[in-house]
């Protein structure tokens, strides 16, 4: 991809408040790598307008000399001239359209790529508070709006503006008195365009928001279609989508109403100027000073001006739509990326891990609502302290919401601790570069994420350079081969979106195979065997025991039967450690762990 300009040092709110001209200049800066194509497009547009103006400039000689027979050569060469002129005009039109489309598509492709990369570089807190549908809408709908609106707008604005300037030049050349009358309406038209432009920007912003709502609603419903069918929620979802769809339609009709009203208003105002010219020509002094050809030319030029004025008014709405889309895109690009202030490299950790008086509150992630922030929010983690030696297994247990998964999120620096520090090999994890830190961990969560790709590529996602033998070995260890061998293409079988063609247990085994292949010093298992049947779980537990040898493991468990052999077990309640020890010592205490154990094995 071509190099993109540096993101302006604006906050997202500053970007939203930037003027149309500021946003346009910023957008044009993305076209710098394609400036030759842009220059060619401008030349084509100006050439197209020049041919049209030259045609009209021959109207006076045609009336005064050609039709009267005063210049026979004029009429003789006119047919050939028309053919040549239209050929040149067609070539100019092609150059303008093709080159502008080439520049526009490249700019939008770069912008879309940069937007995608920026969104993927945003902190987890940003994704927590932003709907996936709205982000997808920005990447698809908003960027397409920039392409369709701005590219078409530039073509019309440059071409028609050059045409208008050419016509005005001809009008003043033949009769400055009559032409001056037409210019008197310019301030009025400028005021109307300014008012209408503000309306266009406001409605365009609303349309983009409405499209984000449509995308979000559709995505949520499609992802949860089984739940909708199970609970008979079709009519409820139909009604909800209809309401959102209606809002989108209303915003579009507001845009159409403004656009439809602005064009005839400007044309009516222009007609007053035209009528006044007809009235002025009744003056004897003015009528005697111009020839019939001049008068016909002036009237024709003024009439011809109505069409480009209409086109410029129409294209203004599209231009404002494109600028509103730019504002939406730039507001994301101006968000700060995930902070990566670490400067230490880490090739492979020895496996030592420590939490030292760690506190964490989601209040500091900016994901909370205003009402939440006004409350004295309790800590999600409160004074968490423990140490793990290389190869040890720690199990975190407790009721839902006790902070177990939050602790694992801090390890990967999806969030940073509010207080205290987390150490790997006696070094604060915030001192490591993020990429080096995260490649120390394999992570298998309750919510398995697979990609619309082959089984082999999903297993090798964390290690794309893995050999076929390594992939097969990991697949065997996680019991993936048991079902892959029955597929027509084996490990090369495409498993559909998020592994839709696999069962829950099969999807979980693929995720475990992916973790096995990465061969990292740390392993995080967040209920990694929760979706397996009894037989599969037995095989997986054997594989996990092999995997956990010589690796530091953090196991988040609800089923206590899976962590009885853990070196350390920490029982958490409301973000605090209430007990810790091994299985036997905690049972002997007859405390919180023993109570959880008795509940599960009664």
Curated annotation (Swiss-Prot):
Listed GO MF terms: ABC-type oligopeptide transporter activity; ATP binding; ATP hydrolysis activity; ATPase-coupled lipid transmembrane transporter activity
GO CC term, one of those recorded: plasma membrane
Protein's cellular compartments: Cell inner membrane
Binding site for ATP: 398-405
Membrane topology annotation: Multi-pass membrane protein
UniProt keywords, alphabetically: ATP-binding, Cell inner membrane, Cell membrane, Lipid transport, Membrane, Nucleotide-binding, Translocase, Transmembrane, Transmembrane helix, Transport
Cell inner membrane found in the keyword field: yes
UniProt-listed Enzyme Commission number(s): 7.5.2.6
Catalytic activity: ATP + H2O + lipid A-core oligosaccharideSide 1 = ADP + phosphate + lipid A-core oligosaccharideSide 2
Domain ABC transmembrane type-1 intervals: 39-321
Span of domain ABC transporter: 362-599
Transmembrane segments: 36-56, 80-100, 154-174, 176-196, 261-281
Alphabetized InterPro entries for the sequence: AAA+_ATPase (IPR003593), ABC1_TM_dom (IPR011527), ABC1_TM_sf (IPR036640), ABC_transporter-like_ATP-bd (IPR003439), ABC_transporter-like_CS (IPR017871), ABC_transpr_lipidA (IPR011917), P-loop_NTPase (IPR027417), Type_1_exporter (IPR039421)
Keyword DNA-binding: no
Domain notes: In MsbA the ATP-binding domain (NBD) and the transmembrane domain (TMD) are fused.
Quaternary data: Homodimer.
Function: Involved in lipopolysaccharide (LPS) biosynthesis. Translocates lipid A-core from the inner to the outer leaflet of the inner membrane. Transmembrane domains (TMD) form a pore in the inner membrane and the ATP-binding domain (NBD) is responsible for energy generation.
Similarity comment: Belongs to the ABC transporter superfamily. Lipid exporter (TC 3.A.1.106) family.
PANTHER family attached to this UniProt entry: ATP-BINDING CASSETTE SUB-FAMILY B MEMBER 10, MITOCHONDRIAL, ATP-DEPENDENT PERMEASE MDL1, MITOCHONDRIAL
Name of the protein: ATP-dependent lipid A-core flippase 1
